[in-house]
Swiss-Prot record:
EC category name: lyase
Coiled-coil regions, chain positions: none
Assembly description: Homotrimer.
Role summary: Catalyzes the reversible cleavage of pseudouridine 5'-phosphate (PsiMP) to ribose 5-phosphate and uracil. Functions biologically in the cleavage direction, as part of a pseudouridine degradation pathway.
Designated name of the protein: Pseudouridine-5'-phosphate glycosidase
Residues that bind Mn(2+): 139
GO molecular function, one term: pseudouridylate synthase activity
Catalytic activity, reaction form: D-ribose 5-phosphate + uracil = psi-UMP + H2O
Keywords for this protein: Glycosidase, Hydrolase, Lyase, Manganese, Metal-binding
Length: 303
């Protein structure tokens, strides 16, 4: 076992040491979020997108028990093909390390490892949050509590729309995690540009985000800054279709007695099948849109 974890690739370490822009990318989208072989193509495209923008990509995952910041192309291929790869949140990291497991890191684990490596910007698709019925089940993503103590910039299209978004926004406020809309005053709903919930703050440029980060750091606040970046309306899932399919998914989950951790993959799979894979294409568009904004923010912060 390496004496110091995570292992940071030479390319990422040199970029950080030189003050060049770096953007972290998670790997559960590779291991669990997208079907094969599309998962590998999207992972490669995201890294290429960052490089074309003059930014060093740092895809983060765990390979054979080694948390790694800046996976090689071969390591990404291995994770993309590994049907035994596990989903690794922050609490799972010591277990994965001790047992030599391989897996994709969630938003929580990726944020933790990125910050430990010194990376300041992280782009993902959608944030985890508070699940429906959490008042009795206490089912809430570790993403939220991790971001409360991890001072980086997270770019996402809001939180996944299967969640209780009103409760998620309340928890973000309670945890002192600032949320700013990017060119919007409405919280995005992942598949749709507008979840129906207002945001108090918005920014119009990457430079404004950089200024917010500078102010946060000067105040020595330890929370992440969540930049809520909506998918362009012309590329979103039709809002009425989204509403109907989501309601049907919940009804089917209740009929089959599916709840807790099993509900997320069930609901997402139902939405994908019910929309004829249209939701899959929107998912990828959301991710690419956030990667592009993450690159712009990283450049602004490095400049």
């Amino acid at each position: 076992m390496p004496l110091s974890l995570p292992v940071i690739s030479t390319e990422v370490r040199q970029a950080l040491d030189a003050g060049r822009p770096v953007v972290a990318l998670e790997s559960t989208i590779i291991t669990h979020g997208l079907p094969r072989p599309r998962n590998l193509a999207v992972a490669r495209d995201a890294e290429r997108q960052l490089r074309d923008a003059g930014v060093v990509p740092a895809t983060i995952g765990v390979v054979a028990g080694t948390p790694t910041v800046g996976l090689t192309g071969e390591q990404i291929e291995e994770l993309a093909a590994d049907e035994a790869a596990v989903k690794i949140s922050t609490r799972d990291l010591p277990v994965a390390v001790a047992r030599g497991a391989s897996g994709g890191t969630t938003v929580a684990a990726t944020a933790f490892l990125a910050r430990k490596a010194g990376i300041r910007v992280f782009a993902t698709g959608g944030l985890g949050g508070v699940h429906h019925g959490a008042a009795t089940t206490f089912d809430e993503s570790a993403d939220l509590v991790t971001l409360a103590s991890t001072p980086l910039v997270l770019v996402s299209a809001g939180a996944k729309s299967i969640l209780d978004l009103a409760a998620t926004l309340e928890r973000l406020e309670t945890l002192n995690i600032p949320v700013v809309g990017y060119r919007t005053r409405r919280f995005p709903g992942f598949y749709v540009a507008d979840s129906g919930h207002d945001l108090e703050h918005s920014v119009d440029t990457p430079q404004e985000v950089a200024a917010l980060v500078e102010a946060r750091d000067a105040l020595e606040l330890r929370s992440a800054l969540l930049v809520a970046n909506p998918i362009p309306p012309e590329r979103q899932l039709d809002p009425e279709l989204h509403r109907r399919v989501l309601a049907e998914a919940w009804e089917e989950a209740e009929r089959q007695g599916i709840s807790g951790h099993d509900s997320t993959p069930f609901l997402l799979d139902h939405i994908r099948r019910a929309t004829g894979d249209r939701s899959l294409e929107v998912n990828i568009d959301v991710y690419q849109n956030n990667v592009a904004l993450g690159a712009s923010i990283a450049r602004a912060m490095a400049g």
